[in-house]
């Protein structure tokens, strides 16, 4: 680990803010406000960074754009002016807002001619609890989890440059959904802004386009909705198609799969005049970018006229649907299916504006029921897409809960909301057996119990006497599978039951697909049920040691290893079968806590280690003051940075150990104690906020050890010895 020269507190924004401890030790009395770093090798020959800090209650201010002013928690942000946009350049703090999740491979690709579904998220001005990058403690937050039904997610607000909060990009990308920000100008001020960059020469609008592309590329979202809702001068409107063409071309170069969409507002004369359709007055903008988002007051005759206008680009016309049903619109609210029926009849894509109506206008206590009702009414008009890459791992966590659970063990109690932590969600709804059978299975979110995170998947169903089993398809996949695949399912039944649960999968390319270790369930040979492993293979024991065992919280894990050659994995199903010999009607309630599908060879590859953990941007606040007027307890806030190959990580769990009263800088960590969980990070940095610690006495060091636990994409626990570590030693001024 390289170290730099001693830095002042004002330079703490740099990534490596300290000097070797032995060089700085003699400078402590002369420079009591400075921080020092050293290295030591512990008994296990692991390198550990040590930082020294003299407590001060006058920290340097943090840049307001990036941090909540009251707590210093990192926040997502927007830009309000053209000057802010052109001046933007990435700082260290911008790293908090960079998406960890790449856009996963999906089928069909977004570029296919199939009509698409766009969700435009407009909720109460935007940047609500979702702005807190590391999550927040809020009850009954809004959540979206029907990702398999949508293709594009637009984050909308009335700020000039709406950069999507990173939590939405992480959640959407995990489901193969691309994310767009919004560039909007409105009213007289918007007209002046447009005049400033569109009415001039080519470099003026190219500079704006370049900056929009750089922002999308840096924060790892996928493009922009351009919404000019003010009149344009002749010079400005003349340059607008050129601006769109340049922006689209540059975005396609820098952001693979990137999109630029134009909202139906200004016409080619420069007049602000919504058309509710694509026509000759606005076609020039459609021809200059990737798609056209219509206004909402259309009728079927608008759709009929647009068929000829769009030609081969029907899917690039996104017909707007205001879910709030404001003004003179078709459908909306729980009648939104009427809008979609007409849109799909004519082959267009759909743009659902503000489907958060179910949260904003209906009872919060009934949110999940209303959310499921809303999307179930639209289901027949919403083609799904398939994920086509491994590893495929999900605990069904919604990114929220009333407590946190880590592999069956309760970690913290209290409400939390962290959308970046939302894991891949299944196909929700009611699934009935074909024909006259009365068998069914319903899938729901379950916040009352969890294996990992804050929720699980609840499956309720009925096996009628005339059939032996019922099954529900949870995931649509399109994965060319490797020769050997490891699968795992964690589940529990509610109450006593003899019903059996099994994981099933379907494969494509049946003629060339050779399967080992599975039962064939249908005549075509495409549906299979893996045989559970009683004992995991020795080479996988580190990851699958609990197979077949009862786990914490009453959960059970089943593991499978299957041999495949020339196969395409298409669907994951869960089936429920009646007890042998029984012909009674059987009902069941089952919770799924996790499903894993992993290339077995990837489990044998060595994982990278968390390295170079640093501590900077320290802030102290007195919490409790003793009889002598000195603080006895403190609140510590600081920023951790580390190095790790992010492509290998699902996230990082941050922990700490606290100790006071040691006069030795090499005091051992309380290895026998369980570290305190602080939070989740979806970047190579984390802001610790208001951590309560005991103040150190005169001549003593307080000690906090921070631990960074990597969570690999395969979803297994990493031994604590392989976590990253950094120690903060703090003392009172002499």
Curated annotation (Swiss-Prot):
Molecular functions per Gene Ontology: mannosyl-glycoprotein endo-beta-N-acetylglucosaminidase activity
Alphabetical UniProt keywords: Acetylation, Cytoplasm, Glycosidase, Hydrolase
Region Disordered, residue ranges: 1-45
UniProt superkingdom: Eukaryota
Predominant place of localization: cytoplasm
Cystine crosslinks: none
Chain positions with N-acetylmethionine modification: 1
PROSITE patterns according to UniProt: BRCT (PS50172)
Alphabetical list of Pfam families matching this protein: Glyco_hydro_85 (PF03644)
Domain BRCT, first and last residues per copy: 281-375
Biased composition annotated in UniProt, kind: Basic and acidic residues: 22-31
Top enzyme class: hydrolase
GO cellular component, one term: cytosol
EC number(s) recorded for this UniProt protein: 3.2.1.96
Subcellular location(s) of the protein: Cytoplasm, Cytosol
Catalytic activity line of the entry: an N(4)-(oligosaccharide-(1->3)-[oligosaccharide-(1->6)]-beta-D-Man-(1->4)-beta-D-GlcNAc-(1->4)-alpha-D-GlcNAc)-L-asparaginyl-[protein] + H2O = an oligosaccharide-(1->3)-[oligosaccharide-(1->6)]-beta-D-Man-(1->4)-D-GlcNAc + N(4)-(N-acetyl-beta-D-glucosaminyl)-L-asparaginyl-[protein]
Family: Belongs to the glycosyl hydrolase 85 family.
Known function: Endoglycosidase that releases N-glycans from glycoproteins by cleaving the beta-1,4-glycosidic bond in the N,N'-diacetylchitobiose core. Involved in the processing of free oligosaccharides in the cytosol.
Protein name in UniProt: Cytosolic endo-beta-N-acetylglucosaminidase
Source species of the chain: Mus musculus
Gene name linked to the record: Engase
């Amino acid at each position: 680990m390289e170290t730099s020269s001693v830095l002042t507190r004002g330079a703490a924004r740099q990534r490596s803010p300290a000097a070797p401890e032995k060089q700085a030790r003699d400078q402590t009395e002369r420079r009591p406000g400075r921080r020092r770093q050293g290295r030591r090798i512990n008994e296990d020959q692991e390198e550990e960074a040590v930082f020294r800090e003299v407590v001060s209650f006058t920290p340097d201010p943090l840049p307001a754009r990036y941090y909540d002013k009251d707590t210093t928690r990192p926040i997502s942000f927007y830009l309000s002016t053209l000057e802010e946009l052109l001046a933007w350049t990435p700082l260290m703090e911008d790293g908090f807002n960079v998406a960890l999740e790449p856009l996963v491979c999906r089928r069909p690709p977004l570029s296919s001619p199939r009509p698409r579904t766009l969700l435009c998220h407009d909720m109460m001005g935007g940047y609500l609890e979702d702005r807190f990058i590391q999550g927040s403690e809020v009850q009954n937050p809004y959540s979206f989890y029907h990702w398999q039904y949508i293709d594009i997610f637009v984050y909308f607000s009335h700020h000039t440059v709406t950069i999507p909060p990173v939590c939405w990009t992480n959640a959407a990308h995990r489901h193969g959904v691309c994310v767009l920000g919004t560039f909007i100008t409105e009213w007289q001020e918007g007209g002046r802004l447009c005049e400033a960059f569109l009415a001039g020469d080519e470099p003026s609008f190219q500079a704006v386009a370049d900056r929009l592309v750089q922002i999308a590329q840096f924060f790892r979202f996928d493009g922009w909705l351009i919404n000019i809702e003010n009149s344009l001068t002749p010079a400005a409107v003349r340059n607008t198609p050129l601006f769109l063409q340049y922006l689209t071309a540059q975005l396609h170069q820098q952001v693979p799969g990137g999109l630029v969409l134009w909202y139906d507002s200004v016409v080619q004369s420069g007049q602000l005049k919504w058309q509710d359709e694509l026509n000759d007055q606005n076609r020039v903008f459609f021809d200059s970018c990737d798609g056209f988002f219509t206004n909402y007051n259309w009728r079927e005759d608008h759709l009929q006229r647009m068929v000829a206008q769009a030609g081969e680009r029907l899917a690039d016309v996104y017909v707007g649907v205001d879910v709030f049903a404001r003004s003179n619109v078709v459908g909306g609210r729980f009648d939104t299916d009427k809008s979609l029926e007409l849109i799909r009849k004519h082959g267009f894509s759909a743009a659902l504006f503000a489907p958060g109506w179910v949260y904003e206008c209906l009872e919060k206590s009934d949110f999940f029921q209303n959310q499921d009702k809303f999307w179930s009414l639209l289901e027949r008009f919403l083609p799904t897409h398939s994920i086509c890459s491994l590893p495929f791992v999900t605990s069904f966590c919604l990114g929220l809960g009333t407590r946190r659970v880590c592999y069956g063990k309760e970690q913290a109690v209290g409400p939390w909301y962290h959308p970046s932590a939302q894991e891949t969600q299944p196909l929700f709804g009611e699934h009935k057996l074909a024909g006259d059978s009365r068998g069914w299975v319903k899938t729901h979110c379950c916040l009352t119990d969890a294996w990992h995170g804050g929720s699980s998947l609840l499956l309720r169903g009925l096996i009628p006497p005339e059939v032996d089993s019922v099954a529900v398809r949870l995931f649509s996949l399109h994965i060319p599978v490797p020769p050997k695949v490891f699968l795992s399912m964690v589940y529990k039944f509610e109450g006593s039951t003899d019903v059996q649960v099994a994981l099933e999968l379907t494969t494509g390319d049946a003629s060339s697909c050779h399967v080992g270790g599975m039962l064939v369930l249908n005549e075509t040979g495409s549906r299979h049920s893996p045989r559970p492993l009683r004992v995991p293979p020795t080479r996988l024991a580190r990851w699958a040691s609990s197979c077949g065992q009862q786990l914490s919280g009453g959960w059970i894990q089943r593991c499978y290893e299957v041999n495949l050659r020339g196969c395409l994995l298409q669907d994951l199903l869960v089936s429920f079968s009646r007890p042998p010999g029984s012909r009674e009607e059987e009902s069941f309630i089952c919770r799924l806590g996790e499903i894993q599908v992993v290339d077995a060879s990837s489990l044998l590859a060595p994982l990278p280690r968390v390295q170079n953990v640093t501590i900077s941007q320290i802030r102290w606040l007195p919490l409790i003051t003793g009889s002598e007027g000195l603080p006895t307890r403190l609140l510590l806030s600081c920023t951790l940075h580390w190095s790790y190959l992010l492509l290998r990580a699902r996230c990082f769990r941050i922990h700490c150990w606290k100790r006071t009263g040691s006069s030795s800088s090499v005091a051992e960590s309380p290895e026998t104690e369980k570290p305190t969980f602080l939070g989740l990070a979806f970047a190579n940095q984390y802001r610790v906020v208001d951590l309560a610690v005991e103040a150190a006495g005169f001549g003593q060091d307080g000690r906090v050890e921070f631990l960074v636990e990597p969570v690999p994409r395969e979803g297994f626990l990493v031994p604590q010895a392989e976590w990253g570590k950094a120690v903060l030693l703090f003392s009172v001024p002499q």
